[in-house]
Amino acid sequence: MDGNDINIQKNEFSRDQSALLMMDQHSDHKNHESAIGEPGMSYTASQPALSSTEHQTPLVSEASVAAPQNHLNGNSHESVSEMDRNSVDFAIESVLMKARAYNKMGAPKDPRRKQHNPKSEPKIEPHVTDSSDNQAAMSNKMEAEAPKMESNQNYVSNGSEPPFRFVSISNFDEMKTKKKEVQEELKLEVDSDSEEDDVPEQKTPKESDRCGGCGKFTHEDDLIALEEEKKKEKEKPLMSKKKSHHHKKNDFQWIGCDSCQTWYHFLCSGLEQFEYYLYEKFFCPKCVPHTGHSIRYKVVAPHRYRWYSPNEKHLGIEVGSKTWIEDFITRENTVPSPTDDEVCIVEDGYEFRREFEKLGGADNWGKVFMVKDMDGLNMTMPKPGFDLEDVVKIMGSDYEVDTIDVYNQSTYSMKLDTFRKLFRDTKNRPLLYNFLSLEFSDNNEMKEIAKPPRFVQEISMVNRLWPDVSGAEYIKLLQREEYLPEDQRPKVEQFCLAGMAGSYTDFHVDFGGSSVYYHILKGEKIFYIAAPTEQNFAAYQAHETSPDTTTWFGDIANGAVKRVVIKEGQTLLIPAGWIHAVLTPVDSLVFGGNFLHLGNLEMQMRVYHLENAIRKEIRSEEKFYFPNFELLHWMYMRNVLLEKITEANQEGSDMREQEKNIWTASQIMKAEMERWMDRELRLGPEKNAILPTDDKNKIMISVRKQIEIQTKIQNAKNKPMGLKQKRKSRESAERDDEDYCPSSSTAYKKKYTKKAKKDNDDAPKVKKAKKEEVPEEKVPVPEAAGPSEVTAPLTIKIGMGPTEDQKGVVQIFNNQCTSSGRKVKLNQNVADYCGSHLEARVEEIPEKATKSFRELDNELERCEAVHSGEKIKKVKEPKPPKQPKEKKEKPPPKKKEMSSRDRLMKKLKM
């Protein structure tokens, strides 16, 4: 075995770790065959060569060994060139040399260390026993070797270099603490389930090597270029419901041609992302003509995600692997069918609308619907004959889409045309692929071919904030300056999905608790669904955060999972929160989408909390979330809900009576936004936040104010009738009560009132509005023939027409509307005054207008302010501008006619 093939590059320890491991070396530094480790723990210094079916391990060049040696002032105890490179001594000596370099000069500036990826290196497996005997033995050993440690200082005084050096630690307790910390780090590394286990292990070229494709970047420059690229571009969320890897990191890793030994970046090698880990032997495009295509790994563990690893042959069967899917297909029909309370099956869209409204509509949507015929849904779908080739033609053959490697249960990027070729090759399918996230709303042709149902467009929160640019709603938003940039729109309502027969997508909840419409254009799908109960959510969270990949969620859900089969031409409508997995029994092409709406707002927030809890526990930043979820709710509150509440407050109306769903959603959203605001004030704004904190604070101030006003209106309606109205009828009650005796205070008030009236006889009298009096006509009753009897007179009420004043009031209030077009809510006094005439809404125009329109508007604003409790703003009416007076031109002075006398006088003067 060549020395460059020794797997030592990946076993780099930190400064403290290296020194602590060397403390347990044998005291005789000439004997390099002593073991590395401590009592109760054993380490493997060098790994055996990998099998041909495993990934190629990173190589270490002579330059990497010599780099730290150049920093040493003295000669090393034993030269590396004199050692046998095939022995374990070479690995030990390399670690010792690096430790000497760390202790003497600090960390060497080796560019290769910058690209070191600890997740991709083989784990060091410590075998630790927690017995107190081992701890005591370790302590005794360190105390016994203390003189030997001090003796190493003689090398420095003599000018020679010891074979290894030690970290300066003040006492043995600190040393034991340090060693325990290293031990815990190693434990953590073994127990952690890395997301990048299936990423190909990085090969390391020499410093002089350059990429055979681009020829621009050395190994050090790759990461610099990658970091600059990250700063320029914001990382977009991967459109996948499954976890995914850091593909961009892999793009700049190396792969070497096994024929010409030329190094390439993965990005420049001609491979697509889904191929990065597939090949045992890679041949570059230049060598393919005479070597043939690259050779794939053999399948040695089909029951595992890492099916190419012989080390996993004896491990358990993972859910979603080839073996598991083949076995699951044979027994999946034993999953029970749903009840009528869980799934409602209807014939067409018309029946769906009837059942949907009967159950409460979107505000009370909690049941799954399966519609056999799309007729009546007002949904646009491609015509018969449309297939995957048409999708590739419209979107472009080089269009990249995130594709799930089914047997690996991971997401990679793949070109559409590549997927089409694999999809059509039904005989040769060593691996299965399906894509769930081809979002096509940016493609003008594709978005017209497939559109969601009409009711989805009507209730969608996204569609309300970002309407179609060709519609009237878009123009209204522009006029009101409420239009939001298109690049902030969550594009999740129009998806194309395609999957190979046998594909399986594991259990998940659609991002953000969004609801789903799902139409099978070709093929068939089988859904396994579980209702959104707290018990199922708890089981799902435990399942997602568990490192165990061998347990199917349906086995731990206690019979909650039900089976629903959807055939070609049928549509499935799933409300928020339903947990589901999907099996594709035949090749399928599907159109669907996700949407948020106010009716499921509470469940959507519950799922959002569940997602955050799972992400926090597994520390995964790659799970797919609803794009701009919080921004969407901030904008919806500002542009929609706040307007509705303000309008109701101005009218003095109770939202519980007319718009109960708006009021309920506003309260839920306000409580959630308070939490978001509190988090932002404590932890600071999130990275790349679109809406500034100040703007959010302004929205919250307005929301609190308007909700407080609406609450006062509702509380006022809940109170019993006030005392003022009862006091009005007190005098009549007193008159009716014969035994009533007024108190002295009451008598004094009456006396004082009469006296005041007499004193103010000279004051101008104001006529009071008389109540409508109905004349009573007495009808005589004929006397009976018998003895006379006293009978009460019979009264008949005759209805009179409205007076002129009543007609005027009716006309005014019939014509008054708010800005939204609603009828103005009438004052009770006005209703009492007009009586039944106002209810009849007599459409008569008064002969003479009592007030101008400006006065009526002012009166209406005053009434609304009184009902809402706001202060009345007195606004002076602007005086009409004075028109400049026209200047009259003076006529030219008339010449005075001279008489004969005047002429004579003139001559005499001369």
Swiss-Prot record:
Which residues are recorded as binding Fe cation? Answer: H508, D510, H580
List keywords of the entry alphabetically.
Answer: Chromatin regulator, Dioxygenase, Iron, Metal-binding, Nucleus, Oxidoreductase, Transcription, Transcription regulation, Zinc, Zinc-finger
Q: In which tissues is it expressed?
A: Mainly expressed in neurons. Also weakly expressed in some muscle, intestinal and hypodermal cells.
UniProt note: domains: The PHD-type zinc finger mediates binding to H3K4me3.
Enumerate composition-biased segments (Polar residues): 1-11, 43-58, 150-160
Name this polypeptide is given: Lysine-specific demethylase 7 homolog
Q: What Enzyme Commission number(s) apply to this enzyme?
A: 1.14.11.-
Compartmental location: Nucleus
Q: A GO molecular-function term, please?
A: transcription coregulator activity
State one Pfam family annotation: JHD
Q: Where is the composition biased (Basic and acidic residues)?
A: 25-35, 118-130, 200-210, 758-780
Q: What does the record say about how the cofactor binds?
A: Binds 1 Fe(2+) ion per subunit.
Residues engaged in binding substrate: T505, D506, F507, H508, V509, D510, Y518, K525, H580
Q: What is the lineage of its organism?
A: Eukaryota, Metazoa, Ecdysozoa, Nematoda, Chromadorea
- Taxonomically, which superkingdom? Eukaryota
Q: Where is this region: Disordered?
A: 1-58, 103-162, 183-212, 712-790, 864-910
Describe what happens upon changing Q409A: Impairs histone methyltransferase activity
| Phenotype of the disrupted gene, per the record | Impaired locomotion. While wild-type animals move by alternating dorsal and ventral flexions along the body length, producing a regular sinusoidal track on bacteria, the track pattern left by mutants is irregular, with increased wavelength (distance between successive peaks of a wave) but unchanged amplitude of the wave. An increase of H3K9me2 and H3K27me2 levels is observed. RNAi-mediated knockdown suppresses mitochondrial stress-mediated longevity.
Coiled-coil blocks: none
Q: Note the effect listed for W263A.
A: Abolishes binding to H3K4me3
Major subcellular site: nucleus
Gene Ontology BP, a term: chromatin remodeling
Return the Basic residues bias intervals: 748-757
Q: Which organism is it from?
A: Caenorhabditis elegans
Query: Family per UniProt?
Result: Belongs to the JHDM1 histone demethylase family. JHDM1D subfamily.
